[in-house]
A protein has these predicted regions:
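Structural signature of alpha-helical solenoid repeat scaffolds
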Residues: 85, 116, 148, 179, ...
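Amphipathic alpha-helical scaffolding segments comprising HEAT/armadillo-like alpha-solenoid repeats
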Residues: 56-70, 89-101, 120-133, 152-164, ...
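HEAT-repeat alpha-solenoid elements in large eukaryotic scaffold proteins
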Residues: 70, 209-215
Length: 277
């Protein structure tokens, strides 16, 4: 799958949208944060996924080391988790699953990211439990990203729910992951698109609207014609009227990437009329 669209802890990658989430909306236990800062263990495991470069690295040896580290004390477990945010190895899954219930939210968050990199059917139920009930925004945000790697699992409705009610940091990832969860055929694409259309219209956060536009572009090929028309109309309206320039640009990019002659002609007409540059 494609990794979608900074807060000080952790920094997200920037694939689907240009906007960071709002760090003030995230909750992290101050004592845990202070401890982790002192240990210099902060940083988003997802940065490891996005920046992974295996050139010159003995992946098998790295994974063997990671398996050993996951069975060690806290600092070693954090190092092992970073390895499995970079590399895939099914042997890691039995060691990652128990960390989903760790008391430390940074361990839980890192384990969630690692299970996004190493998808397993065994992880689906505990990940969904965390999305619905974990009281830490960083953990739920990580789950919203990771579930995009489980498109064949029953993740669609939980992601829709997260996009409806959770904090902005979680909503923007839910919007991105819906493009993957809904991209397996029309039966899932339509309800995913319906929620993304709603979020594109009403969500107060530009990051979420931007990722919703991105997701609609991704889902477009799997939608029936009436829904495709609705997507085009909504993206055009957003491109012309959204208050945030970044959202307008994302909507335009989504329209251009549809590669539909009629849509491209509409865009050219708007350029000719001076309504867009």
């Amino acid at each position: 799958m494609s990794f979608p669209p900074p807060d000080p802890l952790p920094e997200p990658p920037a694939t689907p949208g240009p906007y960071p989430e709002s760090p003030q909306e995230l909750y992290l236990d101050p004592e845990v944060l202070a401890q982790e800062l002192a240990q210099e263990l902060l940083g988003d495991p997802l940065d490891e996924i996005e920046g992974a470069d295996s050139a010159g690295v003995d992946v098998a040896a790295e994974c063997d080391l990671g398996l050993t580290l996951l069975q060690g004390p806290h600092e070693q477990r954090m190092q092992g988790l970073r390895i499995f945010c970079e590399h895939r190895d099914p042997r890691a899954v039995p060691l990652l699953l128990p960390l989903l219930s760790a008391a430390c939210p940074i361990l839980r968050m890192s384990a969630v990211y690692a299970l996004g990199r190493n998808p397993s059917p065994q992880a689906v139920a505990p990940l969904l439990t965390l999305l619905a009930g974990d009281d830490n925004g960083y953990v739920r945000k990580a789950v919203a990203w990771s579930l995009g790697n489980y498109p064949d699992a029953p993740v669609l409705n939980p992601l829709i729910r997260a996009l409806q009610v959770d904090i902005a940091a979680v909503r923007l990832w839910a919007a991105s992951s819906l493009a993957d969860a809904g991209g397996t055929g029309p039966a899932k694409a339509d309800p995913a698109a319906a929620q993304l259309l709603l979020s594109l219209r009403i969500d107060s956060e530009p990051a979420v609207r931007s990722n919703s536009a991105w997701g609609l572009g991704r889902l477009y090929p799997d939608l029936v014609e009436p829904r495709q028309r609705e997507v085009v109309e909504s993206l055009l309206h957003t491109m012309l009227h959204d208050a945030e320039s970044g959202v307008r640009e994302e909507a335009r990019l989504a329209l251009e990437q549809l590669e539909q002659p009629a849509v491209l002609q509409q865009l050219q007409t708007l350029v000719d009329e001076g309504l867009i540059a």
